[in-house]
């Protein structure tokens, strides 16, 4: 108990160690005195944090001679910090294996359009169209509509000139002078002929010329006019209605006559059949008698029907 009390009394309070404190010569148990040179900041505001630079992009190494991967890894646009001038100035170094792979790579095939334009015949190629350059100043000028052409004025027709009266008078005087000269010449010829002896010459009878109306030229040129038709009294009279040779018979009378004829024919056939059964030898005579009676009955029926139409009495023999 006494030992513990002494140890408690010998202990001294230790201050909290700060980064600026220095260790004493007595080791860890020695008291750390605060530094007299420590400057106390005037303001209590915290200092601004230093900017943290982005980590550099990982470099992709080519695997198995991949040329495209190495080119993309060294491209300045593939890294996130490509804006910095230090990283943009860095250039990738192509290894020898990659250079050999690029040199030995087969050439890429040209596109289809280039092959067609190269191997196609020259006459099938269409030349490029040349367009004239449009002057903006000329293009800005508005185009005005063409002025309508004036219609041609109608040419007035020249009026007929009136004939002068002096011309008629001059022509009349000329004709009068000519007639006077002709009459004087005729009188001189008559006087000369009276002085000379007259010798009678035999008269020559010339055939009269064919009249012009009967010449061949006029016959073909002017067709002969047809002679006017003379209408007779019979033709001028109006034609009456033609007589119809077939007489009109009422339908009722026609049907009654047909039924009567059929009735008599049936009765005659029945009587002939009964007589044939009774006496087969007298069949011929009875048939002739029955036929005659049938014919007479038919005639009588039709004469009776046609008698009112003719307006006269008809005997049984008339049909």
Curated annotation (Swiss-Prot):
Residues 150-164 have a biased composition (Acidic residues). Regulates the dynamic behavior of MamK filaments; paralog MamJ also promotes MamK turnover. At least one other protein besides MamJ and LimJ is required for MamK turnover. Might connect magnetosomes to MamK filaments. One of its GO terms (cellular component) is magnetosome. This is MamJ paralog LimJ. This bacteria makes up to 20 cubo-octahedral magnetosomes of about 45 nm in diameter which contain membrane-bound crystals of magnetite (Fe(3)O(4)). The center of the protein is Glu- and Pro-rich. Residues 30-52 have a biased composition (Low complexity). Its main location: other. Disruption phenotype: Single gene deletion, no effect on magnetic response, the magnetosome chain or MamK filaments. A double mamJ/limJ deletion has wild-type magnetic response, but forms large gaps in the magnetosome chains reminiscent of the mamK deletion. MamK forms bundles in these gaps, but the MamK filaments are no longer dynamic. Keywords: Biomineralization, Magnetosome. Residues 1-59, 145-176 are annotated as: Disordered. It comes from the Bacteria. GO terms for biological process: magnetosome assembly. It is found in: Magnetosome. Belongs to the magnetosome MamJ protein family. It comes from Paramagnetospirillum magneticum (strain ATCC 700264 / AMB-1) (Magnetospirillum magneticum).
């Amino acid at each position: 108990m006494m030992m513990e009390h002494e140890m408690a009394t010998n202990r001294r309070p230790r201050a909290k160690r700060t980064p600026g404190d220095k260790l004493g010569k007595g080791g860890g148990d020695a008291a750390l005195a605060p530094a007299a040179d420590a400057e106390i900041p005037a303001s209590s505001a915290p200092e601004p944090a230093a900017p943290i630079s982005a980590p550099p992009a990982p470099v992709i190494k080519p695997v198995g001679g991949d040329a495209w991967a190495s080119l993309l890894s060294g491209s300045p646009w593939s890294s996130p910090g490509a804006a910095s001038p230090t990283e943009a100035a860095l250039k990738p170094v192509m290894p020898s294996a990659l250079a050999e792979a690029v040199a030995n790579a087969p050439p890429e095939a040209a596109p289809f359009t280039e092959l067609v334009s190269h191997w196609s015949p020259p006459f099938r190629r269409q030349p490029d169209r040349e367009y004239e350059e449009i002057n903006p100043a000329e293009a800005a000028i508005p185009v005005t509509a063409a002025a309508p052409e004036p219609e041609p004025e109608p040419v007035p027709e020249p009026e007929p000139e009136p004939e002068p009266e002096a011309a008629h008078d001059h022509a009349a005087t000329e004709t009068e002078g000519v007639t006077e000269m002709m009459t004087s010449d005729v009188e001189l010829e008559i006087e000369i002929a009276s002085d000379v002896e007259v010798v009678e010459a035999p008269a020559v009878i010339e055939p009269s010329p064919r009249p012009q109306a009967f010449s061949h030229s006029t016959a073909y040129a002017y067709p002969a006019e047809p002679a006017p038709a003379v209408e007779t009294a019979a033709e001028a009279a109006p034609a009456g209605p033609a007589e119809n040779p077939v007489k009109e018979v009422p339908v009722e009378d026609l049907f009654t006559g047909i039924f009567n004829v059929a009735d008599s024919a049936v009765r005659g056939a029945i009587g002939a059949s009964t007589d044939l059964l009774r006496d087969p030898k007298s069949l011929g005579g009875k048939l002739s008698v029955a036929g005659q009676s049938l014919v007479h009955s038919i005639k009588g029926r039709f004469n009776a029907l046609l008698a009112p139409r003719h307006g006269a009495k008809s005997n049984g023999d008339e049909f």
